[in-house]
């Protein structure tokens, strides 16, 4: 199974596919599937990618500098007209099943200094939705911990 993941990752890299595309596309063939309770195929894809390509994903010049994307999150909140617009969009993303995108929007609100009770509640909802759909030990432990932190 891991040979398949390895070979598909390297094949995708050679075809010029980006990391996130490969993380979303690569799956274990049904005859090798034993569940992902302890690890995740997407995590293995990332590890294989970074083993060969390193930390630089070749997607943005900003990867080469010490300034994280969160440094401009307050600017994004301001440009969006405030946290409420981003919270509404995060709610729409959650309702549409785009939980990971909802988390990105909530991170912008919270990292941009506009975090409030509503953003924390929404983040709890997203984490709970993600928790409900996983049977992975490490991911469920992380999500439960984050829910506890968000609620405190």
Language-model features: locations:
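Accessory terminal helices/loops
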Residues: 1-152
